[in-house]
Amino acid sequence: MSFVWVEESKECSEQRKGSMWKLKIAQGGKDPYLYSTNNYVGRQTWEFDPEAGTPEERAEVEAARLNFYNNRYRVKPSADLLYRMQFLKEKNFKQTIPPVKVEDGEEITYETATTALKRAVHFYSALQASDGHWPAENSGPLFFLPPLVMCLYITGHLNTVFPAEHQREILRYIYYHQNEDGGWGLHIEGHSTMFCTALSYICMRILGEGPDGGLDNAVARGRKWILDHGTVTAMPSWGKTWLSIMGLFDWSGSNPMPPEFWLLPSFLPMYPAKMWCYCRMVYMPMSYLYGKRFVGPITPLILQLREELYDQPYEQVNWKQVRHECAKEDIYYPHPKIQDLLWDTLYIAIEPLLTRWPFNKLVRERALQRTMKHIHYEDENSRYITIGCVEKVLCMLACWVEDPNGDYFKKHLARVPDYIWVAEDGMKMQSFGSQQWDTGFAIQALLASNMSDEIGETLAKGHDFVKKSQVKDNPSGDFKSMHRHISKGSWTFSDQDHGWQVSDCTAEGLKCCLLFSLMPPELVGEKMEPERLYDSVNILLSLQSKNGGLAAWEPAGAPEWLELLNPTEFFADIVIEHEYVECTASAIQALVLFKKLYPGHRKKDIETFIKGAAQYIEDRQMPDGSWYGSWGVCFTYGTWFALGGLAAAGKNYDNCAAIRKGTEFLLNTQCENGGWGESYRSCPEKRYVPLEENKSNLVHTAWALMGLIHSRQAERDITPLHRAAKLLINSQLENGDFPQQEITGVFMKNCMQHYAAYRNIYPLWGIAEYRKQIPLPLR
């Protein structure tokens, strides 16, 4: 299958005139392999409808695609326009409030702030889904989607899961995010890497493009980049694994991933339960596939790719020699010598032993069975969503390898649509959806607007979604023996079916429920039962470390030296669980409010928690007064959270040096136009890097503005707040939206994440807090 892009034939164009993508909410269909704990609340899936859409609507979609393509090197993240167009039409939304502008030298009046805020509130309320959540794209890494295509190709399900229109949109996404040098970055804003260039290249070829095909000669340009940068022998370890699975690399060219890891005794420091959950979940199916030395069908395409991806005959590659090779463009975390020594020991001495009789029967077979037991457990406890997209594809493939016709694999196939998102830049794979995360902040932003009477229905639906999305049970059975922590009372990043507790998602969910409990039930619905709030508190208290900080998923505490064994080359801090400033600050704010409303419940434990957590935040401050943000870009994000947490804990500018230093950091980084703008490079470089040309970003501006409001900056000099608010107000678009700018999310120091909802949530919230907290003159 090959797609013509630049000039479609008239016949093809006529066939596609009536075609539209539609976002479906909270639907499970009649698939017998699909099930839910919560009637699919929060589920968001895209369907292609060949009959939908008027000529004007289809033209609007095509114009959005063309506009993205023409500006693809200037603004890399999508504006998430397809879902927005659909919802605004379904709600019959028309912005009836005229826009406002603040002229130079003009004061911001209360009326001006109110008008801008009301426009933002009405617009964003119209984007709410029927089940109460706010859908949004959550993607950005370019290694998410190709392995899914590769897995479906291997298993023979590519054309059923991804029919022609899906494949067209996948190719669109790949083409639209190719860098000018012909390669693809680790994420959409990143420099080209061997990992994502090779994966994207293989994906294009699987989807029917020839060696010289693709938009703008994409395939040939990608191949040239690969050959110019050392060929795929320089793939990082994850890439070598996927190439080995595809039959494009020999397993002997990969470092060992023995499944015997799952048989290790608990007293060892590298026992699975001591690993960070995502690290554990990635290497679980990887070790199964490695232990099996699984290789997919060697098709004519695979034989062609063997010729295209190397600069020497495939049979002549010295696999043993390329094991430690990695392109310099891919290296963020260089392996220490001790790690290479460990791999060499496993490769030379241990692995040959485990693959020979009698150990292949006595040990390897048992290890593979234990590994699959864990895979099935994790699959069942996430309703086959799994913990994330990287793990999803690997677990799905492992289930197929175990039994190609089995129910386990069919249940996995049924959940593939949960990961797919479509926007004007094409079809991509999400991390796993940010439904609860985005909705928690959206609700707080809307509540801060003090416009509840105008948006009561919106708030009631949001409240209902949050209540329904709380996890009601712990993982099944003896979950501790399966290396799992309690989850009852938590909120996940996405929806209840996902099942994985996250501390900051829990804190923000708890905060929403507590804020709603202060409001009339006839407006926002019945408040949550106290016992369920207590369960949430238990989760938060259980995740605090001795240093006062809060871990994200599971209790931290494994020895730090285990990070020396980080097997990836492009992530940092992935081996063990760590504490995070943002999680800690979120929990402080939630527990302070909980303590005020439920003063008798675990009072001493909560007070001890808050004291330790505040101290942790102070201890983590950087010399320049900032805090490093682990989940957003970067020091601006971390500082907003830290100042909010410290303020909630009773600290202020006068009694807390950390707040004074944090305030100075924000004031020192304000741009000339009144905003803030921080480059994503701050995250990997661990130092503040402004955007090029000192540009501002509205999301960063809102974070900084709210941080300064937390520190009560208005009591000292109100001008920086007015300047920031002016930029937010003047940047609002005609319909009440805000423009999409640079990427603002991150994970594991080096990989950026696009949160499409942030451009609405945070400018709205910033203006709301400004209007609420700052005395403004009346007109």
From Swiss-Prot:
Reactions this protein catalyses: (S)-2,3-epoxysqualene = taraxerol
GO biological process entries: triterpenoid biosynthetic process
CDD domains: SQCY_1
Catalytic center residues: 504
Renumbered ranges of PFTB repeats: 167-208, 659-700
GO cellular component, as recorded: lipid droplet
Tissue/organ expression: Expressed only in the epidermal cells on both sides of the leaf and not in internal leaf tissues.
EC number: 5.4.99.35
MF annotations from Gene Ontology: beta-amyrin synthase activity; intramolecular transferase activity
Signal sequence bounds: none
Keyword field: Isomerase, Repeat
Described purpose of this protein according to its UniProt entry: Oxidosqualene cyclase that generates taraxerol, a triterpenoid product. Taraxerol is probably required to coat the leaf exterior as a defense compound against pathogens or herbivores.
NCBIfam families registered for this protein in UniProt: squalene_cyclas
Family per similarity comment: Belongs to the terpene cyclase/mutase family.
Designated name of the protein: Taraxerol synthase
Organism: Kalanchoe daigremontiana
